[in-house]
Swiss-Prot record:
NCBIfam families: bioD. Keywords: ATP-binding, Biotin biosynthesis, Ligase, Magnesium, Metal-binding, Nucleotide-binding. The active site is at K42. This is Dethiobiotin synthetase. Belongs to the dethiobiotin synthetase family. The lineage of its organism: Eukaryota, Fungi, Dikarya, Ascomycota, Saccharomycotina. ATP binds at residues 22-27, 117-120, 184-185, 213-215, 220. It catalyses: (7R,8S)-7,8-diammoniononanoate + CO2 + ATP = (4R,5S)-dethiobiotin + ADP + phosphate + 3 H(+). It comes from Saccharomyces cerevisiae (strain ATCC 204508 / S288c).
Length: 237
């Protein structure tokens, strides 16, 4: 059996990044975790001096249509200031983040997918060597032994064309096109932006809106594709 066939039989790691901060990565990660019955890991958490952190947010977010209780793994690094990891380290000089420190949690049974939520966007600096989120994604591809894919979360409204295309093209230029599941647009549905992005070759996985009722949650979960269908699509492409 070749390595590609072996990877296809393994549960994937899906890295969720965004076009900006506060675009809804944690909300979308929550939906994906419940849709796919996945585990969750936030490798680097910042801003814990004033916020409970995304792991707690995801844990406390109740999905009425789901009985799944996701395994949630502790961040490798948790920094106090609500800044990029590089900037947050300036306030904690004893912390020195290195890519080699990021190892897939041993507690992950690999019986289900693992959703990994990044900090900010693809160019956010993570280490003192100025390694960025994209470098972390590559590191996981090289070291995890599992197929690794990327989901980009973007706003649905005005300005998303520029931000989404910059992010998409950056990932493609860094050799990650074959790892891209696609983009999830978060916010009020905007079919014009969907069609415009498709013209540039961007795969739109779904549009999701903020859920205010259990019915809304059920509808959003139903609209999201299965991880198996996405992996099959990547194999065909």
């Amino acid at each position: 059996m070749n390595s590609k066939s072996q990877q296809q039989e393994q549960q994937p790691i899906v890295f969720v990044t965004g076009t900006d901060t506060d675009v809804g990565k944690t909300f979308v990660s929550t939906l994906l975790v419940h849709k796919w019955k996945a585990a969750y890991w936030k490798p680097v958490q910042t801003g814990i001096e004033s916020d409970q952190g995304d792991s707690e947010t995801l844990k406390n977010f109740k999905i009425a249509a789901s009985t799944w209780q996701p395994p949630i793994f502790t961040p490798t690094y948790a920094l106090q200031k609500p800044l990029s990891p590089l900037q947050a380290m300036e306030y904690e000089p004893n912390v020195d983040i290195r890519l080699l420190d990021f190892v897939v949690p041993e507690e992950w049974s690999a019986e289900n997918p693992l959703v990994v939520e990044g900090a900010g966007g693809v160019c956010v600096p993570i280490t003192r060597k100025l390694e960025i989120t994209t470098d972390l994604i590559k590191h996981l591809i090289e070291t995890s032994g599992h197929p690794v894919y990327v989901v980009v979360v973007a706003r649905s409204g005005l300005g998303t064309l520029n931000h989404t295309l910059l992010t998409w093209n950056h990932l493609c230029d860094n050799g990650l096109r074959s790892h891209l599941f696609g983009v999830i647009l978060n916010g009020e549905p905007n079919e014009g932006n969907v069609q415009a992005l498709k013209k540039f070759g961007v795969n739109i996985m779904a549009q999701v809106a903020q859920c205010t009722t259990a019915h809304d949650q059920d509808m959003e979960l139903h609209e999201l594709p299965s991880v198996e269908s996405l992996m099959t699509q990547q194999d065909v492409e």
